[in-house]
Structures are given as structure tokens and as C-alpha cells.
């Protein structure tokens, strides 16, 4: 694949972040801010974006952490993850991104080529 044929919706090719520990506070705060931004931007009230916004709340992420993470074991992300998401589900890429981030990883996601409004709203919210 030619690098010039890649269209970045969020982020840049040269910028991959360092690995973090799972459920890093910076990611939890980012997701909580994303939740608030999605609520504001989702003017058409897409139900799948409302569900994503609810999922990203700090309280929900803390519940996930408490139920699935042992803080006594030192863990770090593996590095860079590459996701290929289904083309018929406009918000699936966001959940894939969220779990990659919560695992402490940088993420590269191939999103559907369909022009979903929900995808645009989510990417815009991430940038804000």
C-alpha cells in the first residue's frame, strides 16, 4: 500500500504514542472527556453514539477496571495495534479503539469506506 493513499481521519503517520499501563488515568480522563463531547456534538441523537457516550463515562471505565484488572500485577501495552473493523457497523471502530487504548496501546484502525455520519461525529469528537 502506498503511504500517499492513506487518509488519516485522526492523528498522523509519524505520531504513535508510547505504550501505557492498562487503564492509564490519562486514557480514562480522555474517554470521560470524549463521552461529554459526544453528548454535545450528537445533535441528531444517533442512538449508537449515545450508547458509546454512555460506555465511555469514567464510572463505567472504572467498573471495567475493577472487574477485569488486577492492579497487583505490573502490565504494559504491547505497542501498536492494527484493527480492521466491519464495514456495516459505523461505531464498531470506536469500541475497538477504546479497548486498544485501555490496554495501553497505540492504535491504527482501518475504518469502513462507507461515509457514515456517526463515524464523522466520533472522529470530530476525538479531535476536539
Task: Label each region the model flagged.
Residues 67-127:
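Conserved small-residue-rich beta-alpha loop and adjacent elements
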Amino acid at each position: 500500500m502506498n503511504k500517499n493513499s492513506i487518509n488519516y481521519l485522526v492523528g498522523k503517520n509519524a505520531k504513535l504514542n508510547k505504550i501505557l499501563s492498562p487503564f492509564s488515568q490519562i486514557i480514562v480522563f480522555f474517554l470521560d472527556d470524549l463521552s461529554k463531547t459526544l453528548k454535545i456534538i450528537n445533535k441528531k441523537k444517533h442512538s449508537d453514539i449515545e450508547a458509546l457516550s454512555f460506555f465511555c463515562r469514567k464510572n463505567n471505565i472504572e467498573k471495567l477496571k475493577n472487574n477485569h484488572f488486577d492492579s497487583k500485577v505490573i502490565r504494559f501495552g504491547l505497542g501498536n495495534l492494527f484493527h480492521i473493523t466491519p464495514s456495516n457497523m459505523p461505531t464498531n471502530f470506536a469500541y475497538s479503539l477504546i479497548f486498544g487504548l485501555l490496554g495501553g496501546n497505540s492504535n491504527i484502525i482501518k475504518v469502513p469506506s462507507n461515509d457514515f455520519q456517526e463515524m464523522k461525529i466520533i472522529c470530530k469528537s476525538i479531535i476536539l
